[in-house]
From Swiss-Prot:
<keyword id="KW-0460">Magnesium</keyword>
<keyword id="KW-0648">Protein biosynthesis</keyword>
<keyword id="KW-0547">Nucleotide-binding</keyword>
<dbReference type="InterPro" id="IPR012340">
    <property type="entry name" value="NA-bd_OB-fold"/>
</dbReference>
<dbReference type="GO" id="GO:0005829">
    <property type="term" value="C:cytosol"/>
</dbReference>
<feature type="binding site">
    <location>
        <position position="413"/>
    </location>
    <ligand>
        <name>Mg(2+) 1</name>
    </ligand>
</feature>
<dbReference type="GO" id="GO:0006430">
    <property type="term" value="P:lysyl-tRNA aminoacylation"/>
</dbReference>
<dbReference type="InterPro" id="IPR045864">
    <property type="entry name" value="aa-tRNA-synth_II/BPL/LPL"/>
</dbReference>
<feature type="binding site">
    <location>
        <position position="406"/>
    </location>
    <ligand>
        <name>Mg(2+) 1</name>
    </ligand>
</feature>
<dbReference type="GO" id="GO:0016740">
    <property type="term" value="F:transferase activity"/>
</dbReference>
<feature type="binding site">
    <location>
        <position position="413"/>
    </location>
    <ligand>
        <name>Mg(2+) 2</name>
    </ligand>
</feature>
<dbReference type="InterPro" id="IPR004365">
    <property type="entry name" value="NA-bd_OB_tRNA"/>
</dbReference>
<dbReference type="Pfam" id="PF01336">
    <property type="entry name" value="tRNA_anti-codon"/>
</dbReference>
<keyword id="KW-0436">Ligase</keyword>
<dbReference type="GO" id="GO:0004824">
    <property type="term" value="F:lysine-tRNA ligase activity"/>
</dbReference>
<dbReference type="InterPro" id="IPR044136">
    <property type="entry name" value="Lys-tRNA-ligase_II_N"/>
</dbReference>
<dbReference type="GO" id="GO:0000049">
    <property type="term" value="F:tRNA binding"/>
</dbReference>
Length: 501
């Protein structure tokens, strides 16, 4: 209660200051302010100069930012103002700015946004600063910022009030600046190699391209049920049919699933497709792309994630899913076996399975149970069973498996890719098998998409396709333990609801 009273008192004081400013004819929510410098650009220009060098000639600067600290009494004071690039100290003297501006400076609060004009100089202790000649209040802050040392520590509050998190935690701003640079680097790399960025619908009449529960909505004017897309895949393949031979899309995808450190119901993916390529080509593209991005934005392909040092320099390990399981458990799924025999093996090794699971499902369960989390260095796991890969080509040498790979780094899937299935008869059969699985209770199995099958009947060239989760890639490159750390506004449960996984 006392803390709430204290906050109310602070709010009242700031409201009173606002009223006083307005009574004096000042505008506490000002207009445009022309900056010539930022904290970073000022440091780049003048940090290397000595105190004496800066005094020899005048270096005028104009900056704006949020007041983060303030001190001083009498006729002079210091403050630190913060912009996107960092903080810079300002020095305000009454005899330099005049009585009115100095009174304004003394009245400002931490969190107010100000603009200053002045000259660069260094203090006695060598800190680069601005000797202010003109001081303006640009925005009056009516709420106090969290205390510097005891403030915004609660993780959930940081996610709910990301705007405060960005103000008081510079490393959080750095993460999201880096996220933007990662996307820029990715686009440049693909654009330079002839890929065309496209945009496809986010509302689908039939959800497809992944095994996931969709969000359902309704179009009133058309009186039809629509689904938020669970993948970008099927529309991009239609473009390959149409002759757009190298395409990609970076976009939002929606899956009506649990929230965890690895999952958010709304997330960002890149999907790309290249005609006349296969999954081996896409494997090479994937390692070169990710290594390029790391080198471009971090300056290195050796990164730290948690307790692990990860080497992203190609060429990465490649291992068949069956071989990876055999290495870890000794179980040999190369042997021909029935679905019943596969399920019996699972029970023998305490791998949870359902009675409806086939040989292919069991292989995947073994992999997830015994292998996945142990793949720390970049590893391409290929040869997924047909049963869990309804959109991938069968392997010509062993039709139980597909020409598909997933990329694992630090025990997490980061990419999924195929030699795309372009046989419309086989595709229809795969969809029909998925319908059987839906009838058996798998609500994540694919629906039949007649229009997509029809598009394949016109002929889709051999194609390699790739999907990369942008959020997980950003987590990896920023050493962030939770997906919420790399989403500006992650989905949060209601404050009074129990946590969900």
């Amino acid at each position: 209660m006392s803390e709430e009273l204290g906050l109310n008192d602070l709010l009242a004081v700031r409201r009173e200051k606002l009223q006083n400013l307005e009574a004096e004819g000042a505008n506490p929510f000002g207009g445009k302010f022309e900056r010539t410098d930022t904290a970073q650009s000022m440091k780049e220009k003048y940090d290397a100069k000595s105190k004496e060098e800066l005094e020899e000639e005048t270096h005028e600067v104009v900056l704006a930012g949020r007041v983060m600290t303030k001190r001083g009494k009498g006729k002079a004071g210091f403050a630190h103002i913060q912009d996107l690039t960092g903080q810079i100290q300002i020095y305000v003297r009454k005899d330099a700015v005049g009585d009115k501006s100095y009174d304004l400076f003394t009245s400002i609060d931490i969190g107010d946004i100000v603009g200053v004009k002045g000259v660069a100089f260094k203090t006695k202790v060598g800190e680069l600063s601005v000797k202010v000649q003109d001081f303006q209040l640009l925005t009056k802050s009516l709420r106090p910022l969290p205390d510097k040392y005891h403030g915004l520590k609660d993780v959930e509050q940081r996610y709910r009030q990301r705007y405060l998190d960005l103000i008081v935690n510079p490393e959080v701003r750095d993460t999201f600046v880096l996220r933007s640079k990662i996307l820029q680097s990715m686009r440049r790399y693909l654009d330079d190699r002839g890929y065309l960025e496209v945009e496809t619908p986010t509302m689908h009449s039939i959800p497809g391209g992944a095994s996931a529960r969709p969000f359902v909505t309704h179009h009133n004017a058309l009186d039809m049920t629509l689904y938020m897309r669970i993948a970008i895949e099927l529309h991009l393949k239609r473009l390959i049919v149409g002759g757009m031979e190298k395409v990609y899309e970076i976009g939002r995808v929606f899956r009506n699933e649990g929230v965890s450190t690895r999952h958010n119901p709304e997330f960002t993916m890149i999907e790309l497709y290249e005609a006349y390529a296969d999954y081996n080509d896409i494997m090479e593209l994937t390692e070169l792309l990710i290594a390029h991005i790391a080198k471009d934005v971090l300056g290195t392909t050796t990164i730290t994630y948690g307790e692990h040092e990860v080497n992203l320099e190609p060429k990465w390990r490649r291992v068949h899913m069956v071989e990876a399981i055999k290495e870890e458990t000794g179980v040999d799924f190369w042997n021909e076996m029935s679905d019943e025999e596969a399920r019996a093996l699972a029970k023998e090794h305490n791998v949870p399975v359902k009675e409806t699971m086939t040989y292919g499902h069991v292989v995947n369960e073994f992999f997830e149970h015994f292998v996945e989390e142990k793949l720390i260095q970049p590893t391409f796991v290929y040869g997924h069973p047909v049963a869990i890969s309804p959109l991938a080509k069968k392997n010509p040498d062993d039709p139980r498996f597909t020409d598909r790979f997933e990329l694992f780094i630090v025990g997490r899937e980061h990419a999924n890719a195929f030699s795309e299935l372009n046989d419309p008869i086989d595709q229809r059969h795969r969809f029909e098998q998925q319908l059987v699985e839906r009838e058996q209770g798998d609500d994540e199995a694919h629906m039949m998409d007649e229009d997509f099958v029809e598009s394949l009947e016109y002929g889709m060239p051999p194609t390699g396709g790739l999907g990369i989760g942008i959020d997980r890639l950003v987590m990896l490159l920023t050493n962030s333990p939770s997906i919420r750390d790399v989403l500006l506004f992650p989905q949060m449960r209601h404050k009074d609801s129990p946590a969900t996984e």
